[in-house]
């Protein structure tokens, strides 16, 4: 049975700091609100804001200029692109928009502007790569204090556990690990997160963490904090306190500033 990927766009500690909470009494409830707020942001924008390693299938386009393939998703980097004619070389296509990811479409060179498919154009194109809005990461300052020699181990020892927070998506070598708990220097994680493969890691390996876009983090903080504080007010449809306007969506309050932020982050195509 596959374990679902975890993506939080704010850590538990960061939300508690925002709310001025130091006790652990409501940690389970706060985690649920972070999870729900992060999923809400992804659902409304149609985007993921952590990198995900995945294989995606596409119908071969017909009649588009230069064989333009619109991905409907954010592509950060390509491992391979194949159609029924085999693997494409990196020099046989361009990724758009030019110069920087995330990419939203693939165009073939003018000299070979059609995709190859045999019996059907459906799912004739396969793209393996890293998907998502961004892949920014920081060095946590911590390292592995002892090798992570098992691909199934759910804990590791960090050189300084105080530098790691619950809810972070860590990167060690090429594996993503989602932090579910920290006790002193012992870190509990979900292995092989977001499509990466659980692997062994050497002692002293650098521990990085993915950093979401600031607007995304702020939106999740506002939503999770608001839902925690106003969790018993679901029957109200809208409310204004001074300049702070809130609309209720499916019984959950969503500030206008969050709605505006998510609208800006939603792609046009």
What are these regions (language model features)?
Residues 1-269:
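Divalent metal-cofactor coordination and adjacent catalytic microenvironments
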């Amino acid at each position: 049975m596959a374990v679902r990927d975890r993506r939080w766009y704010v850590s538990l500690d960061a939300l508690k700091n925002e709310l001025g909470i130091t006790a652990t009494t409501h940690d389970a409830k706060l985690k649920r609100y972070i999870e729900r707020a992060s999923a809400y942001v992804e659902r409304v924008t149609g985007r993921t804001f952590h990198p995900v390693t995945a294989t995606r299938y596409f119908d071969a386009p017909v009649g588009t200029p230069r064989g333009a393939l619109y991905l409907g998703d954010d592509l950060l980097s390509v491992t391979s692109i194949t159609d029924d004619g085999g693997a494409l070389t990196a020099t046989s296509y361009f990724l758009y928009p030019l110069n920087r990811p995330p990419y939203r479409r693939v165009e073939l060179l003018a000299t070979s502007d059609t995709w190859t498919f045999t019996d059907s154009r459906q799912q004739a194109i396969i793209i393996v790569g890293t998907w998502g809005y961004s892949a920014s990461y920081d060095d946590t300052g911590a390292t592995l204090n002892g090798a992570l020699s098992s691909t199934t181990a759910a804990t590791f020892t960090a050189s300084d556990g105080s530098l790691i927070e619950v809810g972070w998506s860590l990167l060690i070598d090429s594996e993503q690990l989602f932090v579910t708990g920290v006790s002193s220097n012992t870190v509990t994680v979900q292995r092989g997160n977001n499509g990466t493969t659980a692997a062994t890691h050497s002692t002293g390996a650098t521990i990085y963490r993915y950093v979401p876009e600031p607007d995304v983090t702020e939106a999740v903080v506002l939503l999770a904090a608001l839902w925690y504080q106003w969790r018993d007010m679901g029957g109200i449809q809208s409310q204004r306190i001074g300049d702070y306007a809130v609309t209720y969506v499916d019984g959950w309050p969503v500030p206008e500033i969050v709605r505006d932020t998510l609208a800006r982050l939603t792609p046009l195509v």
